[in-house]
Amino acid sequence: MENFVISNIKARQVLDSRGNPTVEAEVYLENGGFGRAIVPSGASTGSGEALELRDGDKERYGGKGVLKAVWNVNSKIKDVLVNNTSDLHAVDQMMCELDGTENKTNLGANAILAVSLATAKANARAKNLPLYKYIAEIAGTEDEMSIPMPMMNVMNGGEHASWATDFQEYMIIPKGAGNISDAVRMGAEVFHALKEILKERDYPTTVGDEGGYAPRVRDGNNEPLECIKLAVERTGYYFGKDIAIAMDIAASEFFDKDHYVLKTNGDWKSADDMINWYDWIINNYPVVSIEDGLAENDWANWQIMTERLGNKIQLVGDDLFVTNSKLLKKGIKEKVANAILIKPNQIGTLSETIEAILLAKKAGYKTVMSHRSGETEDVSIAHLAVGLGTGQIKTGSLSRSERIAKYNELIRIADTNSNLGLVNPF
């Protein structure tokens, strides 16, 4: 438990990478410790996520302002925390008790998480530790610290790119890399080669929210896999050995009652059709991870998919679990998925984020730290991934500086700590 005392808290409204308002918070300690954090925002969100408090005033930012959340930090949260301990678990507990709701409806998860992350940074600075070491210390994961394998989003679809494809993300995993610098280089080389492939097919090379290319492909949801294959081969890497693929289907976004309705062509597919499709994909392409392959409420079919494909591939629950330990416990009990995506703003405090990661690891589930589509220059998730030893990280493409910032921070961390090796979970 930290013996530091919080002397001041301040929040303000700033912008995320999509030009939408978000919350930035600063925490000051009596001993001079200081932390600043900005929270991100999602596009495709799970229904069980903690509440992101927006103003709803159509006269300002189309109703997306966060002045209410900022006011909550500068008044209610500040009144409770100033002159109190900066111990992270205590701070998070006090904020949750002050909010008084399960999904942080009153104060807003965006207000609470901003203060939670800023407090962690202030404590780390007060102890003269990098954030990742402080996180490992409070979580008891010092022996698990490592550089995560990146999942790099190179083609966007779904909600992130106006339904250019039905599937939301096509990612490359530079699993043949020996260190994070090589991983970033390999990813960048494939990303640039992919641009040339798309140009040759007369596709535009504009990018989506997360920096991946977002062309409206002509030949269906498998065409991006072919384009990536050609890009990998053009760079001289071995498809499958050096570069593998991960996909985020985000199936909840096109689920309708008991069917999956593809928005690009109107086809209706059953859950069994979707599972068969994934089975075909992993037998024809080096796809090693599928996220949200079925809808968040389609639990019975998630069980079937896990039974059929769980020994072949990583099945990641994002909307399914929303970084919530209660939902993860249900998934573990019912043998649903075998990995969890971790997004701190889905649950709203750093303490609860750590709890979900530790629970997943204990159950043998893999963990993937993740950004959001509305990101910021804040690099906290790079430190969380290292300090908590998540083994994998999703932080976007090899373009857009809010994505690159996380890769650069991982390079810095590795450069200053030679004991931290790049993990290859595949």
Language-model-derived ranges and their functions:
Residues 169-180, 205-221, 250-264:
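Active-site-proximal beta-alpha loop/turn segments in soluble metabolic enzymes
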Residues 222-426:
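Catalytic core of soluble alpha/beta enzymes
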Residues 93, 130-153, 242-246, 289, ...:
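Beta-strand segments within the central parallel beta-sheet cores of soluble alpha/beta enzyme folds
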Residues 1-22:
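Short, Gly/Pro- and small/polar-rich lid/capping loops
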Residues 48, 140-141, 145-208:
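Mobile "lid/hinge" segments at catalytic clefts and subdomain interfaces of large enzymes
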Residues 40-129, 138, 184:
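Metal- or metallocofactor-binding catalytic centers and their adjacent structured scaffolds
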Residues 81, 115-123, 127, 170, ...:
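Buried hydrophobic packing segments
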